[in-house]
Amino acid sequence: MSKQFILAIDQGTTSSRAIIFDKKGNIKKIAQKEFTQIYPKSGWVEHDPMEIWASQSSIVREALEYARVSPRDIAAIGITNQRETTVVWDKNTGQPVYNAIVWQCRRTSHICDEINKNEDLKKYIRKNTGLIVDAYFSATKIKWILDNVDGAREKAEKGDLLFGTIDTWLIWNLTKGEVHATDFSNASRTMLFNINTLEWDKKILEYLDIPVSMLPEVRSSSGDFGHTHPSTLGGARIPIAGVAGDQQSALFGHCCFEEGMAKNTYGTGCFALMNVGDKPVFSDAGLLTTIAWAEDGKPTYALEGSVFIAGAVIQWIRDGLGLVRSAEDSEYYATKIDSTDGVYLVPAFVGLGTPYWDMYARGTIVGITRDTRREHIIRAALEAIAYQAKDVLDCMKEDTGLDWAGLRVDGGAVQNNFLMQFQSDILQSEISKPKINEITGLGAVFLAGLAVGFWKDKEELKTILTTEKTFEPKKDPETVAHDYKGWKKAVQRSMAWAE
């Protein structure tokens, strides 16, 4: 057996995963391990970087062992990761100076408020990074660590500290410190990377007082990120050849290679991306402009809409409210009634993303009457996921003038047929669910496989992806418009709540 497999390292917000694929895209083995979510204060979210590395390395070894695959049988590794989450570590010891500050964390909202008072800087950041100023992105998280961790700024100015998003942290550990690099897609989510010049932006770095020496080298998403150190994976030196942030990786996994193709991923958050080609398109409707991936140093751009809370609202009604015993139960209860009877749940637990960008919005349930039951709340939670996706996808149509012949979907929540049908109804569009649900991991191995010749070209990749189920709209446009109007009203109730 020689080089018959390719490995995806899929490091997510709540779990570390390893997926072994064969050349036909079949999954040989998936291994997964959850890790600790740390909430030091209201609105703060952290992870332990050492626990992330320990969980990810152990789960890779477990996947290989259970699949009876030798590390030497792996042609390459593709890495995909939760984006924006920020790690700062000492390059001499390899030890983090603080916990990883997670993308969901709102602790730097006050820094963003100060930036937003500077209209010229705010516009500069929008035009050159493609992002809006928000605590979501890495830039202000790095500044917070440098300003609040004892000795961090002094060490950084001496050149002793390194920054990385999770991909960079994993690459550093896999290579035992030989490679400090990221890819274009992850770099474009830091609010420090100029997507026009394709370099770290000196003006933003200077304003935030972040030394450029901390930042990783930016490389093509499909290409050379070094090899695993023999001590990390059973003595083998496996090429790390594909890297992309989770949402961009999913776009690649869906084979959305042409301009105008779009996908929506339903995970902890909800993320829609549309391929807009080889030149950035800037949004008038609150969408982010981002780099989807880069090959041979040439980027493909995308528009993205980010919803902070999607699948996490189902976790909340299960764990927080105890309304269901499992996520799967939500579909059962939602289909026991014909509608929510005017109940809307807006899951703005950590603010609202696209197109509202309100850091101070908070969750709300409206329309409750004496007749409201468990089923109405559960159904409203599921519908909220679809409504938020519609908010984003409508903006994409508006900004690009492009429509799509259907939408490609993936993520844990696509197993919920009620949600997918409701999504098709309110979009008045076809929804396609692929047979392979591990699209994010597939995108990472597609990028890695192209780099090492495991697959020859994108046309071959398209033959691997097949559709399992298609959802067609069943509701009439008038009903959809009425229900969506109620959603927009509910969103207004949730906004500008926190201080």
Swiss-Prot record:
EC number: 2.7.1.30
Pfam families: FGGY_C (PF02782), FGGY_N (PF00370)
Enzyme class: transferase
Amino acids binding ADP: T13, R17, T268, G311, G412, N416
Reaction it catalyzes: glycerol + ATP = sn-glycerol 3-phosphate + ADP + H(+)
Annotated binding of glycerol, by residue: R83, E84, Y136, D246, Q247
Positions that bind ATP: T13, T14, S15, T268, G311, Q315, G412
GO biological process per UniProt: glycerol catabolic process; glycerol metabolic process; glycerol-3-phosphate metabolic process
Activity control note: Inhibited by fructose 1,6-bisphosphate (FBP).
Family (UniProt): Belongs to the FGGY kinase family.
NCBIfam families: glycerol_kin, PRK00047.1
Function: Key enzyme in the regulation of glycerol uptake and metabolism. Catalyzes the phosphorylation of glycerol to yield sn-glycerol 3-phosphate.
The protein, known as: Glycerol kinase
